[in-house]
Regions:
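Short hydrophobic targeting helices and cationic amphipathic motifs
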Residues: 4, 8-9, 14, 22
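Short, positively charged and aromatic/hydrophobic N-terminal segments
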Residues: 12, 23, 29-30, 35-41, ...
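Conserved non-catalytic scaffold segment of RNase H-like nuclease domains
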Residues: 50-171
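A short, structured active-site edge motif that brings together acidic residues
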Residues: 100-103, 185-203
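Acidic, Mg2+-coordinating catalytic module of metal-dependent nucleases/exonucleases
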Residues: 157-164, 168-169, 211-275
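Substrate-recognition/cap helix-loop segment adjacent to the acidic, metal-dependent catalytic center
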Residues: 164-191
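Short alpha-helix plus adjacent loop in nuclease-associated cores
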Residues: 193-219
């Protein structure tokens, strides 16, 4: 049996033994000692989290319209069928990923799913479900697992790019499925943050980003820089041919790079959706 430690060392023991041991790890960055005591009673692999890390959760959704005759994309007219998230730190390191397909919508609302913007991807979703890449389950189970991850990692902040949309559609879906018995998808008291606001404050003041947008015509009708996740990722990665996949977890993995990039600049920026 093996035990994975936060410092990435691996310790092996004979199966069935009860082992109590103490590991003292010297922090290279802060020169502090971290003591971890582990009791091992069975053949399991245990990952020990570093409690000094301020873990964050980045989430993304894909949706279908409730009323397909409504012009425009509004969270109040959207149900969530794809939810992906990752537990990360501010440097963008990933500690856990999740990818779920909401069976209540994906299977229960097949007619509406055919009007989803990315309906052509439905066959690929089924392939991913069969291969285990995505998990098909109820919205209630998805929410339960989210709450468990938040508790396990001590998460106090949830991020999305254009969080106003994801926050809205998740709540609309939650209220419809529970008949408004439960009105909010996220736990009470969690800080709701938006990488779009961060990017506008950080990249919006960078001459290099402005020049990049002008050079590639990534501008609004009024001539202002655009701040879509796809365009920002093209800038920070140097991959100007990058195309966003527009599935939950795949988009999360580029949005966490935006989060990390903004933090690396050490600039004053807004994070919270409502501030």
């Amino acid at each position: 049996m093996r035990v994975l430690l936060s410092c990435f060392s691996v310790v092996k023991f004979s199966p069935g033994r009860f082992v109590k041991f103490l590991i003292i790890k010297k922090s290279i960055d802060k020169l502090k000692k971290c003591a971890i005591i582990i009791n091992v009673r069975n053949r399991k692999e245990i990952e020990i989290m570093d409690k000094r890390i301020n873990y964050k959760l980045v989430i993304d959704t894909e949706t279908c319209p409730i009323n397909k005759d409504v012009d425009g994309v509004f969270p109040s007219n959207m149900w969530t069928y794809d939810v992906g998230w990752a537990v990360v730190d501010k440097r963008g390191k990933v500690y856990r990923t999740r990818s779920f397909v909401n069976a209540d919508i994906f299977c229960g609302e097949k007619e509406l799913m055919r009007s989803a913007y990315y309906a052509k991807k439905i066959p690929q979703y089924w392939e991913d479900i069969k291969s285990g890449k995505r998990t098909l389950t109820s919205f209630a189970k998805i929410r339960k697992i989210l709450f468990a991850d938040i508790k396990e990692y001590g998460i106090t902040e949830i991020y999305a790019h254009n969080m106003r949309f994801d926050y809205g559609t998740l709540n609309v879906t939650q209220r419809w499925i529970t008949k408004s018995a439960s009105r909010f998808f996220f736990p009470y008291g969690i800080e709701i943050c938006d990488t779009l606001k961060m990017a506008r404050d950080v990249l919006g003041n960078m001459p290099t980003y402005k020049a990049f947008c002008e050079r590639n015509n990534y501008l609004t009708k009024n001539g202002a820089c655009r701040f879509t996740a796809e365009i920002i990722y093209r800038f920070i990665s140097g991959k100007n041919d990058f195309v966003e996949e527009h599935t939950g977890l795949a988009d999360v993995l580029i949005e966490k790079e935006i989060l990390a990039y903004c933090y690396r600049q050490h600039k004053k920026m807004r994070r919270h959706l409502w501030k």
